[in-house]
Amino acid sequence: ISWKKSMRWADHELYWGRPLKSILCCFDNKTLEFVYHHLVSSNITFIDKDFEKKTRKFVSFKDYLAFFKSKNIILDNKKREQFIEDRLNKIAKKENLKILLNSNLLNEVTNIVEKPNIIKCRFDKRFLEIPDDILVTTMQVHQKYFPTFDTRDNLTNNFFLVADNKDIKGLIKVGNENVVEARLNDAKFFWDKNKTQNLVKGISNLKKLSYFEGLGS
């Protein structure tokens, strides 16, 4: 498997999409042993919990599935995506909101969480003066949030985020609301600044720009 961007673990020479720490390989209730670079497969995997490295042995795939299910971790990608979509729609309906469910964003957040939890947040209504496209781009592209609309299809100041755990103390909600507040303050500043510029002159300035495909990121 080739990756555009790879990482390696410590001083080992193995490059992968993410640093590999261990390989769990079992079949028919038996451990299949093989060597891949510096790693030797086993029936043990590492579980990060409260910043501690803990090990867990598995004798079968059934045992493996049961363990993660008990931790509310959804291993199956399709089931995890469906769970997120269903929860988003259910909460939005309960709040009398319409959710902007972008399929690319849904796929992206599905792949960055293990035990998804939907959290409803909001930003200051004064930012609704900014054009919808700017607000939606800020929420979807930069923050991975799901914007919402009211029954008249007007963008609201409510949005949903998909967290990777329960927000018991409400810190995830507050933290994300603070982050989007800063983002929207920046967006409003540049929007207000752009409104003072002459549009025709701005278009003519595009002639001064040069575009190079594949340069930078």
Kindly give the residue locations of the regions a language model identified.
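Long, basic N-terminal domains or extensions that often function
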Residues: 1-129, 133-135
